[in-house]
Regions:
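Extracellular and select intracellular beta-sandwich modules with Ser/Thr-enriched
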Residues: 8-14
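Short beta-strand edge segments in extracellular beta-sheet folds
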Residues: 15-21
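Ser/Thr/Asn(+Pro)-rich, low-complexity disordered segments
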Residues: 22-455
Length: 455
């Protein structure tokens, strides 16, 4: 495929054609080296923001914050990348993975309010030290899916005939088999969002296209407590096909919903019944959603500062709010952490650079210039130990501003993981290759009606 170059190609894009680049900081780096630097900086979060005693990863870098089970699952999936890239010795990665899996296998499960989980699923947030439920939060089905996907990744990758790596494989398998997916349906056709010990199942169910694609594949693939095949059909019956900004695609507003399942599953060339009817696959769908994001930023219907061809990425992220103020005569509402989306909002001018990075496999021709902008013009990795900060907002006039506006003071584990893993899928397809070798993924895909391609 021939990609039309912009008149003044960014340093990252220019390398694709001429072999080496000179960036704005006058450092000569290949695209590969620049991407690897971003991967390593992002991985440093998991290296330094994990409790080595239990493997739990802090949700964000704010003091006294709890662990996120989704971030912990992304860390488990990132350890193979770290070994392959030389970010971490294999022995250290084995120790981290084994510590994490032992913790979850041995942690208390039950209906009591201060456990770690129930029915093989886990509370969304856990105390970093004790591993018990934090904030009276919900037991989260989708965040448990990210945790279990990470465990399965470790189980496939650590395949050496050593006692520790054998135990990793056994624990990953046991944790996955323990999850009672049928329980999460609460008698309904689809899966609930979660459960609380005080009040039972949450009233919300997974409906409409979103990151639950991974959840359903894992649930369908279970050899012990599988979801019925009808549950997947019930979920896809809630899909909404949309036409916006010249793109026809299966709609979901926040960009992360088009990315997170693709961290683990290579959807290129495989289709379920819904996608067969549309004549595309989920990978192509994510490419179109990525282009819709860029085109929305170019159009910039709400006239926010900074939006443009190389400045986009609207997703669930930190923000400068909650606040409502007048900016240049226009009353603007700003949010804190919320699931921002395109084109129907919410949108308050907040850009998340990790969202662009996680679309790299789908549309490198527009993602690489966006990364170049974030690194070399907005300088969102400068003076940061962990690569990109969570988000920035050029429109917001409050504190924590620099030349490019408000910048989040935090890093989030849920942002760091997709940067590492989707860059790696773009570079080598490592996660996709690993999970092709996971029989539960293949079984779940087939039971969902997927066929074709590598499957």
């Amino acid at each position: 495929m021939t990609v039309a170059l912009p008149r003044t190609p960014s340093p990252l894009v220019r390398y694709i054609y001429v072999g080496r680049v000179e960036t704005m900081s006058s450092k000569k780096l290949t695209v590969d080296a620049e991407l690897e630097k971003l991967q390593q900086e992002s991985f440093n979060y998991f290296l330094h923001e994990t409790n080595p005693a239990n493997g739990l990863v802090i949700d964000k870098t704010e003091a006294d914050w709890p662990a996120s089970i989704a971030a912990t699952g992304l860390a488990l999936a990132s350890y193979p990348v770290a070994v392959e890239r030389g970010f971490m010795p294999r022995a250290a990665a084995v120790e981290r993975a084994l510590t994490t899996l032992r913790f979850f296998w041995n942690s208390p499960q039950g209906p009591e309010p201060d456990t770690t989980g129930y029915h093989g699923f886990y509370y969304h947030f856990l105390d970093m030290q004790t591993g018990r439920r934090a904030w009276k939060c919900e037991l989260s089905t989708v965040d448990s899916a990210f945790l279990l996907a990470g465990a399965l990744t470790a189980g496939v990758y650590f395949a050496a005939h050593t006692p520790d790596e054998h135990e990793i494989r056994m624990l990953a398998d046991a944790l996955y088999r323990r999850a009672d997916w049928q329980w999460t349906q609460d008698g309904g056709a689809t899966v609930t969002h979660g459960w609380k010990s005080e009040s039972g199942f949450l009233k919300y169910r997974w409906g409409g296209y979103d990151e639950a694609l991974l959840l359903y594949i894992l649930g369908l693939g279970s050899p012990t407590h599988p979801l019925p095949e009808e549950s997947y059909a019930a979920w896809t019956s809630t899909y909404h096909w949309e036409h916006c900004y010249g793109q026809e695609y299966l709609y979901a507003g926040p960009l992360f919903t088009h990315q997170l399942s693709h961290v683990w599953i290579d959807f290129r060339g495989i289709q379920d019944s819904y996608m067969r009817d549309k004549g595309i696959d989920y990978f192509e769908n994510s490419r179109r959603a990525t282009y819709a994001q860029q085109l929305y930023a170019i159009d910039n219907p709400l006239k926010f500062e900074g939006y443009g061809r190389h400045c986009w990425g609207i997703t669930a992220s930190d923000g400068p709010g909650p606040d409502t103020i007048k900016v240049n005569g226009i009353e603007r509402q700003f949010f804190n952490y919320v699931g921002r989306g395109v084109p129907y909002g919410p949108d308050d001018g907040t850009i998340a650079p990790w969202a662009a990075a996680a679309s790299l496999p789908f549309a490198p021709e527009i993602v690489l210039p966006a990364l170049d902008y974030c690194i070399h013009q907005a300088k969102l990795t400068e003076l940061n130990s962990y690569g990109f900060k969570a988000s920035f907002n050029p429109t917001y006039p409050g504190i924590f501003r620099d030349a490019h506006g408000w910048v989040s003071p935090w890093h989030y584990g849920l942002n760091q993981g997709p940067i590492i893993l989707m860059i790696e899928n773009y570079r080598t397809g490592l996660l996709w290759q690993l999970m092709r070798n996971c029989p539960y993924i293949a079984s779940g895909l087939r039971r969902a009606g997927f066929a074709g391609g590598w499957l």
